[in-house]
């Protein structure tokens, strides 16, 4: 029996009125109508890019390069008996994965909204591109207008946008960072025309853009436990490194209520709070005891790294977010149902547990909403066993009691809208249980003995 694919990511504008979600290779947009409490579909975009076509272009390009190289070396072409050159005319062969090869997924990643809330950004695995959509709220047919699709040499792992919303900064899986002006023309010859603005020697996992005293900075995190702070756009000037992590860093954020603070998390079993201006670690919050009751068989280490008892479990923070205008952070450990909310004492910069919330299914993504009326978190869930229920939960702060709670009625309305949008059996996001895209990739960043040899 087919099911609607779980939501991989969900983000909203500050008021929470506009919601954008990713299901498989589809982005869908909704508007919350406060008069009747319903969610109205505002637009939809499906990534229809053909990976085969991209591979074919690469094969043709390589064939042309080899022919040119052969001519340069003086290698003779095949000729007829009359001495005429035989032109080989055939289509480029597209490599086909052999038996047992892992499936290829056309994921959409890194969903985010620009600071002025007029653009939606994402990354497409199909052609390793950054997608820029204009959000046309007055367009009743489809509010998502693709205005730029820029492929990159390697797959983007993380993106951010500068405060003026003019430049996207891209960190890829091979350790390179690029910048892209949104209004610049699309670059076709990406291997020759794109130059990294900075680099690491390992896979990049996060990137941020910020300013301090009129100076611009870009912050990057990687698999090698590093956080690097560089000037921007003079990114060859390294301001400092933040050392303290012993495992990979998977998530970094800067709170809007104090831009001198940076919070980081990953394979270590703690949340790190930094004064990045001074390069000092201010505090570390150990969450081990909080999450241990929620660690399960999904966290068993790979067989080749298991202990003799076969009970070694490994876990890591998947994503960490800061609630605007309030000294709160929220995070979750990959493949768990537990959302942990921390509060920061702004006089001592010490973190303490504010609240734990247990969700009905494993959390896959978290983002925030916050304006003068309401604030809280958008949570997407791995609901594959739910019978097409509980795709998303909205969690809001009650300022009177200073506690967070799930907005069940509003969450149910959104989930109903998802079902209505994708209920047809031929829907692109309908899959079998074993066809669900991989949702838990963070712990694969962990290094074992083989990585240090």
From Swiss-Prot:
SMART domains: WD40
Keyword Repeat tagged: yes
WD repeat copies, ranges: 103-143, 244-286
Similarity-based family: Belongs to the WD repeat TRM82 family.
Name the record gives this protein: tRNA (guanine-N(7)-)-methyltransferase non-catalytic subunit TRM82
Compartmental location: Nucleus
GO cellular component: cytosol; nucleus; tRNA (m7G46) methyltransferase complex
PANTHER family reported in the protein's UniProt record: TRNA (GUANINE-N(7)-)-METHYLTRANSFERASE NON-CATALYTIC SUBUNIT WDR4, WD40 REPEAT PROTEIN 4
InterPro entries given in the database record: Trm82 (IPR028884), WD40/YVTN_repeat-like_dom_sf (IPR015943), WD40_repeat_dom_sf (IPR036322), WD40_rpt (IPR001680)
Assembly information from the UniProt record: Forms a heterodimer with the catalytic subunit TRM8.
One Gene Ontology term from the biological process aspect of the record: tRNA (guanine-N7)-methylation
Record Gene3D superfamilies: YVTN repeat-like/Quinoprotein amine dehydrogenase
Keyword Disulfide bond in annotation: no
PROSITE patterns the record matches: WD_REPEATS_2, WD_REPEATS_REGION
